[in-house]
Design a protein with these regions (language model features):
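Conserved Class I S-adenosyl-L-methionine
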Residues: 216-274
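Conserved class I S-adenosyl-L-methionine
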Residues: 164-186
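A short glycine-rich, Lys/Arg-flanked "PGG" loop and its adjoining helix->strand segment in the class I
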Residues: 147-162
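A short acidic, Gly/Pro-enriched loop at the edge of an enzyme's catalytic core
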Residues: 122-133
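N-terminal, positively charged/glycine-rich alpha-helical extensions of SAM-dependent methyltransferases
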Residues: 1-30
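Acceptor-substrate binding/catalytic loop of class I
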Residues: 184-200
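Class I SAM-dependent methyltransferase SAM/SAH-binding core
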Residues: 62-64, 68-123
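Conserved alpha-helix/loop element of class I SAM-dependent methyltransferases that forms part
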Residues: 40-57
């Protein structure tokens, strides 16, 4: 992965969050279309992925590909784990996550604040068997070597630990081969994705001895969430799209691809055997 191309890809996302008061980059999950704000949909996707996973005051949680830190903050606030570490490849996002955490910190409980470090998902900067829950949402699509990433997750998970992974996938990879030619371009229009199918993920999980405990194909509620988010932006008028107009149309196209099932959105929960 290239810092330069990923920075270019995510700059419009950063502008969108700043213009519309959002805390994260994920697509969201709409239980009912029009039933909540896009910000609430984004939080709903986090809770949907975690599901019934046990996170408590003795847990160490790692958010790999934490972006600007919104979900890490939400998880910390709801579950109060002993430690939450956000690992992010882009230095600019690490800085933004630090700033957000400092602004939202509970002064009476300074230890509850998540910490953020720069790191590569292919070489996670954590000790073997040191993590209880790994959270990875809408980030693995950017990893050129997902097998190494999943192997790294297996390495750092404690026995009985869990991996919660949500990603955009496809069973029609050949359709997106031309888009991958843009991966090297330092432009907001680069795709910067290496898509897997759900079967690819299942094979990799099996190879690492990770037991699948829950799998949801969430394309429809994710597409509904995007539709609500797009409607919110439209409602504020063209001026509110300044600096990310291209990303607005990208998200609208993504919604259509999810509805047509040319792309999918899959949520996986797995456990490392004891």
């Amino acid at each position: 992965m290239s810092q330069r191309t990923l920075e270019a890809h995510y700059l419009p996302n950063w502008r969108l969050t700043q213009a519309h008061g959002l805390s994260g980059y994920n697509c969201g999950y709409a239980v009912q279309r029009g039933g909540a704000s896009f910000h609430e949909h984004q939080q709903a996707l986090v809770w949907r992925l975690i599901g019934e996973m046990a996170i408590g005051p003795k847990s160490t949680v790692v958010d790999v590909g934490c972006g600007i830190g919104g979900p890490a903050g939400w998880i910390t606030e709801r579950y109060q784990p002993r430690r939450l570490i956000g690992v992010e490849y882009l230095w600019s996002s690490v800085a933004a996550a630090h700033a957000r955490a400092a602004a939202e910190a509970d002064r009476d409980r300074p230890a509850s604040r998540p910490i953020f470090v720069q790191g590569d998902a292919h070489r996670l900067p954590l000790a073997d068997g040191s993590v209880d829950v790994i959270f990875n949402l809408e980030s693995a699509l950017h990893y050129p070597d997902k097998r190494t990433f999943i192997s790294e997750c297996r390495r750092i998970l404690a026995p009985g630990g869990a991996l919660c992974l949500g990603d955009i996938t496809t069973s029609h990879r050949w359709l997106f081969t031309p888009a991958q030619l843009l991966n090297r371009l330092p432009s907001q229009y680069n795709s910067n994705v290496w898509l897997w199918s759900p079967k690819d993920y299942r094979r990799a999980f099996d190879a690492e001895g990770l037991e699948l405990i829950r799998h949801e194909e969430a394309s429809r509620p994710v597409a509904d969430s995007l539709a609500d988010g797009i409607a919110e932006i439209r409602h504020r008028g063209p001026a509110s799209m300044k600096g990310f107009r291209g990303r607005f149309f990208y998200l609208a196209f993504l919604e259509k691809l999810l509805r047509a099932r040319l792309l999918r959105y899959d949520l996986f929960c797995l456990r490392r055997s004891r």
